């Protein structure tokens, strides 16, 4: 028999499964220097497009549409099934046409954090809010560090408390530097015991020059 622990709802859960930008709205985008690249709407969390190469510039724009294909089962599915990687690459091509710029060969480093909360944490609004605060502070540190193209996190499911959060980076080195901030390091230590289990998955997206094809592969 599966014991169901109802996940506590918090304000930070709002709108997580709604994309920042829908694929159909690409024609409405304008040339801008900063974009929202995470669930956080405050401007200090926005991504500075001026720091990016052409390939990563197009990728970051495409990732504004990034949400799971299945908002219920995403945390239980393999990454490439949970998210539509082909659609992201297709949008890279669309942005290339829109801005009349060639797509160079480039790659991105992706991290997925899969976790299952302890039942007493899962049902506690205070505990979930604390985790959300650590996430937000860690994102700001990583954004200042540079190279973080996208951050998205979901909501622990009611049955298992299982969840998935993911980051897209320009490189593995950017991810290493971005995860070295004080809030991130100390936050992990403070809440390590709040998880029944967790694991890290690593992936790479390699886009071929011109964007005609791509390779998405696991690194771990």
Curated annotation (Swiss-Prot):
Keywords recorded for this protein, A-Z: Cytoplasm, Nucleus
Keyword Flavoprotein: no
Domain of life: Eukaryota
Primary site of residence: cytoplasm
Subcellular location: Cytoplasm; Nucleus
Cysteines joined through disulfide linkages: none
Keyword hit for Nucleotidyltransferase: no
Any Gene Ontology CC annotation: cytosol
PANTHER family: UPF0643 PROTEIN PB2B2.08
Family, similarity comment: Belongs to the UPF0643 family.
Stated name of the protein: UPF0643 protein PB2B2.08
Organism from which the protein derives: Schizosaccharomyces pombe (strain 972 / ATCC 24843)
